[in-house]
A protein has these predicted regions:
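Structured loops at beta-to-helix junctions and adjacent beta-edge loops in soluble globular domains
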Residues: 30-33, 127, 165-167, 200
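Catalytic core of Fe(II)/2-oxoglutarate
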Residues: 149-217
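Active-site environment of non-heme Fe oxygenases that use a 2-His-1-carboxylate facial triad
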Residues: 81, 101, 125-131, 135, ...
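Extracellular-facing segments of soluble proteins and assemblies that are Gly/Ser/Thr-biased and enriched
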Residues: 67-110, 114
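N-terminal auxiliary "cap/dimerization" subdomain that precedes the catalytic jelly-roll/cupin core
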Residues: 1-79, 83
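Catalytic core of non-heme Fe(II) oxygenases with the double-stranded beta-helix
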Residues: 106-160
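Catalytic micro-motifs at enzyme active sites that drive phosphoryl/nucleotidyl and oxygen chemistry
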Residues: 16, 108-112, 184
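Short intrinsically disordered coil segments
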Residues: 44-47, 138-140, 211-217
Length: 217
């Protein structure tokens, strides 16, 4: 299931990571469409797959850990997610990563916040994408009220791949990109669903050695 990272996309990721770590910007977004094959696999994940797969390891480890819990019709989604794990590993220099693929139906993480990691990859496969706001020096997530001015809120389109610097990033000065999961509770029931991939360092919160992988059907 694993394949070598696309050289072009790997170069884009390495350049993006270099820009973040050189202080040119705390965030980069790689735009891409979702193929028909991938969209069908996402639908299969929603219908038949687990609500959560949380694991850590190398991409090869993740393939072995996650494959038994995915329906065969959703394998193209897992293959894409593992491909992004490889790209993140190459760009970040980490050997192992934390991998979280989940179906979200609540207002989880709806408040604007920053992450206590160096670098995080986010990709929304289905539903509303992650929202973020620009900040000026000295502003914190707690001091912002972007809901008062919706024009301040930006949304990452589904399928696009985002790299966000966290609080531990070398140029973050203790504060990474301010972002949130978009609230879902105000939407019709049929629209209250996101499929989100999060990849970051293996020591990130929520990862326990004794439960690798953690799977919720």
């Amino acid at each position: 299931m694993l394949s070598s990272p696309c050289p072009t996309r790997l170069s884009l990721f390495q350049n993006a990571q270099a820009d973040i770590h050189s202080g040119k910007g705390p965030m980069t977004i790689h735009a891409r469409p979702l193929s028909a094959t991938l969209q069908a696999a996402i639908e299969a994940m929603i219908k038949e797959g687990p609500r959560l797969i949380l694991a850590k390891g190398t991409p090869e480890d993740l393939c072995s850990l996650c494959s038994p819990h995915m329906p065969p019709t959703a394998f193209p989604l897992l293959k894409d997610a593992l491909h992004l794990a490889q790209l993140y590993r190459e760009a970040s220099g980490l050997d192992a990563v934390r991998f979280r693929l989940e179906q979200i139906t609540t207002d989880s993480c709806r408040k604007f916040h920053t992450d206590h990691v160096a670098l995080r990859l986010l990709c929304t496969y289905y539903g509303p994408g992650t929202e973020w706001v620009s900040t000026t020096q000295g502003q914190t997530a707690a001091s912002l009220s972007p809901e008062d001015d919706p024009a301040l809120i930006h949304r990452i389109p589904a399928g696009h791949i985002a790299l966000l610097e966290g609080n531990k990033g070398p140029h973050a000065n203790g504060q990474g990109v301010v972002h949130r999961s978009p609230p879902l509770s105000h939407l019709p029931m049929s629209e209250r669903l996101r499929v989100l991939l999060t990849i970051d360092e293996p020591t990130a919160c929520g990862m326990a050695d004794e439960h690798n992988p953690t799977v919720r059907p």
